[in-house]
Amino acid sequence: MAVQKSKKSRARRGMRRSHDAISGPSLTVDQTSGETHRRHHVTADGYYKGVQVISK
């Protein structure tokens, strides 16, 4: 089992964790309907990059 040589300080722990924050989903506005949706995902009405890919 690995055992550390010396205790890591709170500052070092914080520096290691500085990149662990979760960012929110990236959103974009659809060209045709103006609807907000997640990037690289089909909108609720079936459009992707301004083209209808799913018909309802």
Curated annotation (Swiss-Prot):
<dbReference type="GO" id="GO:0003735">
    <property type="term" value="F:structural constituent of ribosome"/>
</dbReference>
<comment type="similarity">
    <text>Belongs to the bacterial ribosomal protein bL32 family.</text>
</comment>
<dbReference type="GO" id="GO:0015934">
    <property type="term" value="C:large ribosomal subunit"/>
</dbReference>
<dbReference type="Pfam" id="PF01783">
    <property type="entry name" value="Ribosomal_L32p"/>
</dbReference>
<keyword id="KW-0687">Ribonucleoprotein</keyword>
<dbReference type="GO" id="GO:0006412">
    <property type="term" value="P:translation"/>
</dbReference>
<feature type="compositionally biased region" description="Polar residues">
    <location>
        <begin position="25"/>
        <end position="34"/>
    </location>
</feature>
<dbReference type="InterPro" id="IPR011332">
    <property type="entry name" value="Ribosomal_zn-bd"/>
</dbReference>
<keyword id="KW-0689">Ribosomal protein</keyword>
<dbReference type="InterPro" id="IPR044957">
    <property type="entry name" value="Ribosomal_bL32_bact"/>
</dbReference>
<dbReference type="InterPro" id="IPR002677">
    <property type="entry name" value="Ribosomal_bL32"/>
</dbReference>
<protein>
    <recommendedName>
        <fullName>Large ribosomal subunit protein bL32</fullName>
    </recommendedName>
</protein>
<feature type="region of interest" description="Disordered">
    <location>
        <begin position="1"/>
        <end position="56"/>
    </location>
</feature>
<feature type="compositionally biased region" description="Basic residues">
    <location>
        <begin position="1"/>
        <end position="16"/>
    </location>
</feature>
